[in-house]
Each structure stands twice: as structure tokens, then as C-alpha cells.
Amino acid sequence: MKCVLVFTTALCLLSACTGVPQDIEPVTGFDQQRYLGTWYEIARLDHSFEEGLSRVTANYSLNDDGSIKVINRGYNAEEGQWQEADGRAVFVGDSDVGHLKVSFFGPFYASYVVFELDNQYSTAYITGYNRDYLWLMSRTPEVSEEALAAFKARAVAEGFDLTELILVAQ
């Protein structure tokens, strides 16, 4: 019985990691084909898996099984080398909703929620399963001051704490 309880608890915790923060809606009308390609990380709330990285990019392409291949890459100036993480993303529900789960470690998935995406697919606002995760991604290494201000305003309106926001050097 104890094993069943531990397994059930672990399952619940893992499924919580693929949820959506309360009151945040993933975009609808999401077009996977248009989203594929290279994105530059413009701003983020820092986490241990990206700590100290600059020149961060994410590249998305299709795997043979229909899932999305994810290659995240960033430069660690302290170590003087590039770091790369290969992962796999799949839609949590419908493929026209910007809510995916991504794994870099076997069966363990984390939420990837696109909650803002412009019509040209040139900028995207991303969060994880809670408001501790936030990214501004762009098709270009830089965005205008207006685009950055719009991102910050929307993030604050959605309840994100931006005191630890990092502008990523590209």
C-alpha cells in the first residue's frame, strides 16, 4: 500500500508540472509549422538550468513520430563553452492550443505554455506550470524597447514578479 501511495503521489506531482498557471490562457489557433525554427531568448526569470547562460536560442523541428525536437543552446562565459540540451515536446491537448509538455530527462515533463504570440510569429511569451517561469522569445536576437515594454506590462498584468527578470545578452 505504501508503494501505491508513493507512486500515486509522484504521479500527481509530475502531472502538476504540466499544468497551466491559474488565470493564464494558452493561445488558441496555434500553428505548429509556423512555430518551428529558431527562437532567441530575450528575457527570462533565471533558473539553475540556465544560470549564467547568454546567447540562448531554442530550435524546434519535427521528429519522425510527430513530436517536436527541442534543442536549447546557450553560452556559459564562466566556463568558456557552449551548453546544449536536447529535448522532446508534445501537445498536452489539442495541437492548435499553445500548451505543450517538454522533456529533457526521460519520462519527466515540464509545462511549456505559450500565452502570447503575435500574428507574424515573431515574438512569444512563454511560462511553465507556475509563475516562477517566464520567457520572452523572438525570431531576432533583439527586440524594440516597445516590444520589451509590452512584454513586461503583460507579465505584470498576469501576476509575474519581474524583480529577478534577466535581459539575455545575445
Residue ranges of model-derived segments:
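Positively charged n-region of N-terminal signal peptides that target proteins for export
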Residues: 1-5
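A beta-rich soluble binding module of mature secreted/lumenal proteins
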Residues: 17-170
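Bacterial Sec-type N-terminal signal peptides, specifically the leucine/valine-rich hydrophobic h-region
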Residues: 13-14
